[in-house]
Amino acid sequence: MTGLLNRIIAIGGTTAHQVPKSPETVRKDYIDGPECITAVVAEGAGRVLGWQAIGWWEGDAHIGTFVDPGCQARGIGAGLFARTLIEARAAGIATIHASIRADNVPGLAYYARIGFVDYAFDPDFALKDGRRVGRVSRRFDLR
């Protein structure tokens, strides 16, 4: 999971993360830390093809999705979300939030395709390096 996330960070453009993560940080932030709710992984050919996690952030359940750039638009994200929905419902989550860079065209398309709807927009959201990319906030209601 760490290797995939760090490849996505290195490529840039589809995540607000700009600094590579350690395996310990990925584990704490996405798998079994105190703020983690769910985590699902898609594997194939002996490697991680994608993963999705929900965790508490600012009082809301937020989702993060990371799919190998060479495997996007092949149903991996939809498969992850189907499994995530089962776990989210079992955890009693009413609403899943997604915060997406406004310049992340594939991410915006993915979350729209699986049923997330816009509820806020921050045109001034900036990355750590100062670039303003904007941020779209979307949600998926489970009830």
Please identify what each model-predicted range represents.
Residues I11-G70, F81-R83, E87, D124, ...:
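Acetyl-CoA-dependent GNAT
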Residues M1-H17, S137:
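Short amphipathic alpha-helix that is part of the acyltransferase structural core
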Residues L80, N104-G107:
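Conserved short alpha-helix immediately C-terminal to the canonical SAM/SAH-binding motif I
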Residues I76-G77, F81, S99:
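A beta-strand edge to alpha-helix "cap/lid" segment located at domain peripheries
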Residues C71, G75:
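Glycine-rich phosphate-binding loop
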Residues A88-I100, L108-Y110:
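Conserved GNAT acetyl-CoA-binding A-motif
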Residues W56, H97-R101, A112, V117-G134:
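Conserved catalytic-core motifs of GNAT/GCN5-like acyltransferases
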